[in-house]
Amino acid sequence: MIDAGTDRGDIAITVRDAYKRYGDFVALDHVDFVVPTGSLTALLGPSGSGKSTLLRTIAGLDQPDTGTVTIYGRDVTRVPPQRRGIGFVFQHYAAFKHLTVRDNVAYGLKVRKRPKAEIKAKVDNLLEVVGLSGFQGRYPNQLAGGQRQRMALARALAVDPQVLLLDEPFGALDAKVREDLRAWLRRLHDEVHVTTVLVTHDQAEALDVADRIAVLNQGRIEQIGSPTEVYDAPTNAFVMSFLGAVSTLNGTLVRPHDIRVGRTPEMAVAAEDGTAESTGVARAIVDRVVKLGFEVRVELTSAATGGPFTAQITRGDAEALALREGDTVYVRATRVPPITAGATTVPALSRDGADEATLTSA
């Protein structure tokens, strides 16, 4: 599938009608997918959604039962991985334990019998780019997890790949290291401009790093777009729910931070400019107030249905409301994403063929 607005003359990767089955399990269900040149595209989805199978199909590690893969206009569907011009980084990178960081990064260049001076200059530059200049003489077991993944990326980039494929490269690292590496990866991409496809199940990682996000589910692409597009204008309930916490207000999905909380119905409908907005207001009971740095999570129960839901408000608003367990409050959705059930934002490539509102958790 190709999202509207993508110029087909500037496409690095095209996957067309890819179908892959393992026994009774359909991993890819006639997927169409394109990656613009120089972009960083994230494949996001739950386990079993097909994201890793799609990446491995691009890499040549898996063969589609039907369909084609082209890289910069060259059909590589039956071309082995080592001849596709790709760099690949796995979650658990297999470094050469007996080689130093420098020699690990240089390995691919030595195999290609590049001149020694070229290898030295290339490795020096890459170690500087990935922030490992001071670690070039160390061995992999002397590096922290984040440093090993930086080494892995430098090694993948050393051979000047046309495409860089990353299969959950930070998935085995702790949360703080992952957060730091996300910012680093974005800076690295902006510097080297290699067309990159990143597989992740981490919504924050995809939203933070990617130029475009493809959300997969059950072997299909549900939506492709910029982080802003998929978050603010999700195609369907699955995309919205997968990209963050949701509650249901008046039968529509809303984000917790789009729920206004007030002590009175009037406070719940008051707009920022002081005017009143006519919309449904729901009464709820406060179950718990959890401080999360700048924001505060308010866990609530609908007075109408007894269903639990969550609102996310600023710390300042929470202090002004002075919420406590058991308090009665009034809530209202300030924004509702325009979800259209069954709609799609990825048209296929041409081929044949006034009452009290009720709230529940989603």
Curated annotation (Swiss-Prot):
GO cellular component, as recorded: ATP-binding cassette (ABC) transporter complex
InterPro entries hit by this protein: AAA+_ATPase (IPR003593), ABC_SmlMolc_Importer (IPR050093), ABC_transporter-like_ATP-bd (IPR003439), ABC_transporter-like_CS (IPR017871), Mo/tungstate-bd_C_term_dom (IPR008995), P-loop_NTPase (IPR027417), Sulph_transpt1 (IPR005666), TOBE-like (IPR024765)
Subcellular location, record wording: Cell membrane
Membrane topology, record value: Peripheral membrane protein
One Pfam family matching this protein: TOBE_3
Keyword Cell membrane: yes
Molecular function terms from GO: ABC-type sulfate transporter activity; ABC-type thiosulfate transporter activity; ATP binding; ATP hydrolysis activity
PROSITE patterns: ABC_TRANSPORTER_1, ABC_TRANSPORTER_2, CYSA
Catalysed reaction, written as an equation: sulfate(out) + ATP + H2O = sulfate(in) + ADP + phosphate + H(+); thiosulfate(out) + ATP + H2O = thiosulfate(in) + ADP + phosphate + H(+)
The entry's keywords: ATP-binding, Cell membrane, Membrane, Nucleotide-binding, Sulfate transport, Translocase, Transport
Manganese recorded as keyword: no
Main location: membrane
Positions with a binding annotation for ATP: 45-52
Record-listed E.C. numbers: 7.3.2.3
Highest taxon in the source lineage: Bacteria
Family according to the record: Belongs to the ABC transporter superfamily. Sulfate/tungstate importer (TC 3.A.1.6) family.
Record's subunit section: The complex is composed of two ATP-binding proteins (CysA), two transmembrane proteins (CysT and CysW) and a solute-binding protein (CysP).
Xref: NCBIfam families: 3a0106s01
Name by which UniProt lists this protein: Sulfate/thiosulfate import ATP-binding protein CysA
Organism for this UniProt entry: Mycolicibacterium paratuberculosis (strain ATCC BAA-968 / K-10)
Designated gene of the protein: cysA
